[in-house]
UniProtKB/Swiss-Prot annotation:
InterPro entries in the record: Chorion_S36/S28
Descriptive protein name: Chorion protein S38
Domain of life of the native organism: Eukaryota
Positions with biased composition (Basic residues): 206-224
One GO-annotated biological process of the protein: chorion-containing eggshell formation
Native organism: Drosophila melanogaster
Length: 306
């Protein structure tokens, strides 16, 4: 088998694969499935023919190996053609299967709760609910439900009560449906500031103030201000300083500083370096730090920024 024969066999395989892919990409639904399958079969037959021609010659380039590779590529092309005939947006992974696609179906995603404050996975997004509804007004698909329903945390939950869903031009009685439920969020997004230690004067152990350059309020973290600026009252007058979650960068720096404070003097010097490297939303930190004379929480002390 010469080099030119091998190249021609490989080119025939590539052309067959390309034609199969082009034929399968033209179909957008089940009606184009037969054409895609025919294209895949044609591609497989063409690849097999090329493989036979290449394998029959045999020679220094291994005709048998070339034939096996051609058969493999033909099978891949047929698989791509088969995958192309499925319609977009399968409904096999949803807890209920709609009877029709017009939206006025009996299996609307409306459920009744057994308790309140839960979260229901409701296509296309979860809804946090406040109270059970007595009547639900549904506009058009995608369904808009107000007030939102809730279910128990027993997947899958069977709803025992019935709901009336108002569709134009008549009301439709909705039977109980199967729904998937999820657990509530693992963390609370609105934390209690008193428990977290935000803004409690100098007792806030690095959460909001940064003990590296203890400064006025946030000057150790580069929030600027020698007792002035939008950070408000500092730790000396016992007021509430700016919370550490004011911005993402500030929160990250505050948590990093809190970790560094656990390691003694080396941590304090490293914290001072962190404070000197970054600039806050109110400009760079001034070099004239006002050192704290008040007590520092947990036996710490106020060290100057280097």
């Amino acid at each position: 088998m010469t080099r030119s024969t091998y190249i021609w066999a490989l080119a025939a395989c590539l052309i067959a694969c390309a034609s199969a892919n082009y034929g399968s990409s033209q179909g957008y639904g089940p009606e184009s499935g037969s054409g895609a399958s025919d294209g895949g079969a044609d591609a497989a037959s063409a690849a097999a023919a090329a493989a036979g021609g290449a394998g029959g010659a045999g020679g220094e380039y291994g005709g048998a190996n070339a034939g096996a590779g051609a058969l493999e590529s033909g099978a891949d092309a047929a698989g791509v053609a088969q995958a192309g005939q499925s319609s977009y947006g399968s409904d096999q992974n949803i807890p209920y299967k709609p009877v029709n696609t017009k939206g006025n179906t009996l299996t609307s995603s409306i459920t009744y709760p057994q308790n309140k404050g839960e979260i229901l996975i409701h296509r296309p997004a979860p809804i946090i609910v406040k109270r059970p509804p007595t009547k639900v007004l549904v506009n058009h698909p995608p369904l808009v439900v107000k007030p939102a329903p809730v279910v128990l945390h027993k997947p899958p939950a069977i709803v025992l009560r019935k709901v009336y869903v108002k569709h134009h031009p008549r009301r439709v009685k909705v039977e109980p449906v199967f729904v998937n439920v999820v657990k509530p969020p693992a963390e609370k997004y609105f934390v209690n500031e008193n428990k977290q230690g935000y803004g409690q004067g100098s007792q806030s152990h690095g959460h909001g103030h940064g003990h590296g350059g203890h400064g006025h309020g946030h000057s150790g973290h580069g929030h600027g201000g020698h007792g002035a600026g939008p950070h408000g009252p500092g730790p000396h007058d016992g007021g509430r300083a700016l919370p550490a979650y004011a911005s993402g960068a500030d929160s990250a720096a505050a948590s990093a500083g809190y970790q560094l404070l656990q390691s003694g003097n080396q941590g304090l010097s490293a914290l001072a370096n962190i404070a000197g490297e970054r600039e806050g939303p109110y400009g760079p930190a001034p070099s004239h730090q006002h050192y704290s004379a008040g007590p520092a929480g947990h036996g710490g002390y106020a060290a100057p920024a280097y």
